[in-house]
Amino acid sequence: MKRTFQPSNTSRKRTHGFLVRMATKNGRLVIKRRRAKGRKNLAVRIATK
């Protein structure tokens, strides 16, 4: 049986990215909560070299 986590930066950004969060009301609430908590990263950010 193959493992469930098959990492891909594309699908990661498409489902958990900042623009996707901002697109819906509930997504904006997620960002709001993370701002209030003082998170350094509000949404998934793919590291670049």
Swiss-Prot record:
The keyword Ribonucleoprotein applies. Keywords: Ribonucleoprotein, Ribosomal protein. GO terms for molecular function: structural constituent of ribosome. PROSITE patterns: RIBOSOMAL_L34. Disulfide bonds: none annotated. Pfam families: Ribosomal_L34 (PF00468). It comes from the Bacteria. One of its GO terms (cellular component) is ribosome. InterPro entries: Ribosomal_bL34, Ribosomal_bL34_CS. One of its GO terms (biological process) is translation. The keyword Ribonucleoprotein applies. HAMAP family: Ribosomal_bL34. Belongs to the bacterial ribosomal protein bL34 family. This is Large ribosomal subunit protein bL34. The gene is rpmH.
